[in-house]
């Protein structure tokens, strides 16, 4: 995987107040660890971030008023893959699983389409060749290898 590949950490979902703050939908647990983010062909310098409704409220140095904040609605904010912290053995980033082939007893059953966390652990959504999708619990049903995911047959529809 390219270390320069952009990884989306948040999306601007709207303006907050009159001073240029934005509401963010977060895809990371520690947004404050990243001071410079890219989006819409620009760089943004994170000044402050705090919990907010459905995510967080942030102030960026480059966004000075509500109009500028509203204009960025829908903008995805990313960092290079190389900016993410290193992983311990057995850990993974959700983005690293997306697109990997999924196999059951050596036979392909689909491709990893999405990873969700509903609170009890990660759940992998697999898309079959016919476009139908099914979900399996990562901790109980998935063995993660560098270039593929091995799925326990008991969890396959």
Curated annotation (Swiss-Prot):
Primary subcellular site in the record, as a coarse category: cytoplasm
For molecular function, the Gene Ontology terms on record are: ribosome binding
Q: Entry's Pfam families?
A: PRC_RimM (PF24986), RimM (PF01782)
Looking at the record, the residues that make up the PRC barrel domain are: 89-156
Q: Which UniProt keywords apply?
A: Chaperone, Cytoplasm, Ribosome biogenesis, rRNA processing
Q: Where in the cell is it found?
A: Cytoplasm
- The superkingdom listed in its UniProt entry is Bacteria
A single Gene Ontology CC term: ribosome
What are the GO BP annotations of this UniProt entry?
ribosomal small subunit biogenesis; rRNA processing
Give the matching InterPro entries: PRC_barrel-like_sf, PRC_RimM, RimM, RimM_N, RimM_N_sf, Transl_B-barrel_sf
Instruction: Identify the Gene3D superfamilies for this entry.
Output: PRC-barrel domain, RimM
Cysteine-cysteine disulfides = none
Domain comment, as recorded: The PRC barrel domain binds ribosomal protein uS19.
Q: Which family does it belong to?
A: Belongs to the RimM family.
Assembly and oligomerization: Binds ribosomal protein uS19.
Per its UniProt record, what HAMAP family does this chain match?
A: Ribosome_mat_RimM
Q: Report the protein's function.
A: An accessory protein needed during the final step in the assembly of 30S ribosomal subunit, possibly for assembly of the head region. Essential for efficient processing of 16S rRNA. May be needed both before and after RbfA during the maturation of 16S rRNA. It has affinity for free ribosomal 30S subunits but not for 70S ribosomes.
* Stated name of the protein: Ribosome maturation factor RimM
From the UniProt record, report the name of the gene that encodes this protein. rimM
């Amino acid at each position: 995987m390219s270390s320069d590949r952009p990884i989306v950490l948040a999306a601007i979902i709207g303006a907050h107040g009159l001073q240029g703050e934005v509401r963010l939908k977060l895809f990371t647990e520690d947004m404050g660890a990243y001071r410079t983010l890219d989006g819409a062909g620009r760089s943004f310098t994170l000044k402050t971030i705090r919990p907010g409704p459905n995510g967080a409220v942030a102030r960026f140095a480059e966004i000075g008023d509500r109009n500028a904040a509203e204009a960025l609605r829908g903008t995805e904010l990313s960092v290079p893959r190389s900016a993410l912290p290193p992983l311990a053995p057995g850990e993974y980033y959700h983005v690293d699983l997306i697109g990997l082939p999924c196999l059951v007893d050596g036979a392909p059953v689909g491709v990893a389409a999405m990873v969700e966390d509903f609170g009890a652990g990660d759940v992998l959504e697999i898309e079959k060749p016919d476009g139908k999708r099914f979900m399996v619990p990562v901790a109980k049903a998935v063995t993660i290898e560098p270039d593929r995911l091995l799925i326990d047959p008991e969890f396959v529809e």
